[in-house]
Amino acid sequence: MGILDTIRNPQDLSKLTEEQLSQLAAEVRSFLIGNVSQTGGHLGPNLGVVELTMAVHRIFDSPRDSIVFDTGHQSYVHKLLTGRQDFSTLRQEGGMSGYPDRGESEHDIVESSHASSSLSWADGISRARQLTGDGDRYVIAVVGDGALTGGMAWEAINNIAADKRRRVVIVVNDNGRSYAPTVGGFADYLASLRPTIDSFRAAPAYEGTLDWWKRKLQNGGPVGQFTYRSLHAMKKGIKDWWAPQGMFEDLGMKYIGPVDGHNLQAMEHALSTAKNYAGPVIVHAMTEKGHGYAPARAHEADQFHAVGIIDPETGVPTEAGGAQSWTSVFADEIAAIADERKDIVGITGAMLIPVGLHKFAARHPERVFDVGIAEQHALTSAAGMAFGGLHPVVAVYATFLNRAFDQLLMDVALHKAGVTIVLDRAGVTGPDGASHHGMWDMAMVQIVPGLHLAAPRDATRLREELREAVAIEDAPTVVRYSKGNVGAEVEALERLSDGVDVLARRPAGSSENDVLIVSVGAMSELALDVSNRLGAQGISSTVVDPRWLLPVRKSIIALAARHRLVICIEDGVRAGGVGSRIRQEMRAAGVDTALNEVGLPVEFLDHGTRAQVLERVGLTARQITHDVVAQVLGTKVPFARPLPGQEHPTTGSLPKL
C-alpha cells in the first residue's frame, strides 16, 4: 500500500515525515499521469501544483479555512488529498467533476471554472466571516498568473487590500502560462520577480524585528516618527531595487516570495509566515506546468494543459486522429482571408491555439493580438480597431462571451462597429460540465440591435458564412460552431432568394405540408433524421437551414405559414432562443402556425459526452419524433390562417394512418 492510499482527509498529511511527504508527492504525480491519461483532462496544470497544494492543506485547516481554486481545473491534487481517489470516472457522466464540486465534498467551496473570479469570492467570504464573528478563519485563493491578466482579479485586490484585518491569503501559482505563455505588462512584471527568490524576507525573525522597531520608533515622539518614515522610505527603495515587488505592497498587500513552488518546505514556511501575518498577503509561488512528466515539459504548445486519452509513457494520443475539427476549418479559412485582406486582424483571450488563430498569427504575427484573459477588453478594443479602419475577428469560447455582453451591446453594437465574433465550443460541449457548455449565446445575442448571427451546419458553410460575416462593416456579426469534429457535408436541395437552404422535402414532390423543421447549425443531421422518421409515420416535412439566424429571414415566415406545425431544433436554451425569435416574427407577420422550441432547458447541465447530455434533455431524433407525431396525429395543431392576400390556407390535410 502506498502513502496516497492512506490519505482520507487533509489532517492525515500532518502525520507524515519529510521523507514520506516527498514520497507522497511522487505518488500523486504517478497517480495523475496513470489516471488522467485514461480519461482525459487537465494534466499539466495539476502536475505543477502538487507540492503547492500539499503545503496549503498542511498549513491551513480545510474546510474551516476556505480554499478557493481559480479556474478550478488545477484542483485534482486537492481532490486526492480530500479523499477522492476514484479518478476512473473523472469527467464521465455521473462521475467525478473536472472542477471543484460542492456535491462531492465539503472541502469544495466554489464550483469555479471561469478565470479571475477567485479573489472576488475570497473578498466576499472574508467579509462575511468578519460580520458573523468568524474573522479568525482564513480564506486562501489559489490563482494562476494567467488569471491575473483578467481585470476582475484587480478589482478584487483593490477591495481586499483596503482592510488590513481580513485573513486572506492569495497564492499566486506562477508558471508563466495560462493555456499558452502569459502575455502583457503584468506578465512582464512577474517575470522580473522570478529570479529573486528571497528566503530572508520570509523569515519570522525578519518580520519580528521590523515590527519591534516600528513600534519603538512610532512611539518615540516626533524624532522617532521622522526616523521611522525615513528608514521605511529607504527600505522600500532598497527592496524595489533588490526584489521589485513594490506594486503589491503599494496596494497595501504584504508580499512574500518568489518561492519555489516545488519545494514543499519552502512553501510551508512562506504560508506559515502569511498565516502569522493575519492580514491580506500574497504568496508568490513559482511552478512548472507539467512538472515531473517529460512528455508534458517537452510539449511546447501547452505543456499538456488538457489532454485526451494518451499513452502514459510517451504522452502520444491513443485515440484515432486525423478527423477535421470545426476549429481547424476556421483556422485555415481565417488565415486565407487574412492573406487576402490587410484590414483583417485577430484577437484572442489567452487561447491562440484552442480557438484556431495560430495559423493566422504564424503568417501575420503583427495582426494577431493576445489580450490575456480579458474578454471585456477584447470586445471594446475590437470596436476601437473597427473605428480605425480594421475589421477585427474576436475568437473566444462561447461560454466566455457571457462576460463581455455589455461591451458587445454598448461598445460594438451601439456604435455599429464591423466586428466579427467567432464562438468556438458553442452548444453542448460535454466533459467540462455546466460552466463550459456554450448554451447561452444565442439567447443572449437575440436582444442586441442590428447583430447578425450565423450557425454553419458543416465545413463548407463555415467557410462561406465566415466570409459573409467579415464583409459586413456596419454591424457586429457572430459565427458559432460546435466542439469537436465536423460532420459530413449536408448539401441543400436549393437556396432561397434570402439565403435560406432547403435541405429536404419529404416525401419528395408531396403537396402535403405538415411540419416545417428549422435546423440550427450542427443540428442538421438530427433534423434530417427526424424528417425521415416522420415520413415513416406518413407525416410530410420540409427541413430548412436558415444559415443566418439573425435577422430572421422572410422566407422562414412564409414557409411557416404554409405548414401546420413548425419545430425549431437548436442546441441553445429554449427560453429566448432562435425558436422564440421566429415565433415573435411569425406573430408580427400575422402567422399563427404552432411552433415548438426544441432546445435545451434553462438548467445547469452536468458533464457527460455531447450525445449523453443531449439524450438526457430529450434532444434525440426518437424523442422529437414521438412528440411531433403525438401533436400532428392527435390533431392538436390548428390550421394556419392564409397569408395576407390569400383566400385559403395552403397547409395540407392530416395523414390517415
UniProtKB/Swiss-Prot annotation:
Thiamine diphosphate binds at H73, S113, H114, A115, G146, A147, N175, Y293, E375. Pathway: Metabolic intermediate biosynthesis; 1-deoxy-D-xylulose 5-phosphate biosynthesis; 1-deoxy-D-xylulose 5-phosphate from D-glyceraldehyde 3-phosphate and pyruvate: step 1/1. Residues 91-110 are annotated as: Disordered. Mg(2+) binds at D145, N175. GO terms for molecular function: 1-deoxy-D-xylulose-5-phosphate synthase activity; magnesium ion binding; thiamine pyrophosphate binding. Pfam families: DXP_synthase_N (PF13292), Transket_pyr (PF02779), Transketolase_C (PF02780). SMART domains: Transket_pyr. The keyword Amino-acid biosynthesis does not apply. It is an enzyme of class 2 (transferase). Binds 1 Mg(2+) ion per subunit. PANTHER family: 1-D-DEOXYXYLULOSE 5-PHOSPHATE SYNTHASE-RELATED, 1-DEOXY-D-XYLULOSE-5-PHOSPHATE SYNTHASE, CHLOROPLASTIC. Belongs to the transketolase family. DXPS subfamily. This is 1-deoxy-D-xylulose-5-phosphate synthase. It comes from Arthrobacter sp. (strain FB24). The gene is dxs.
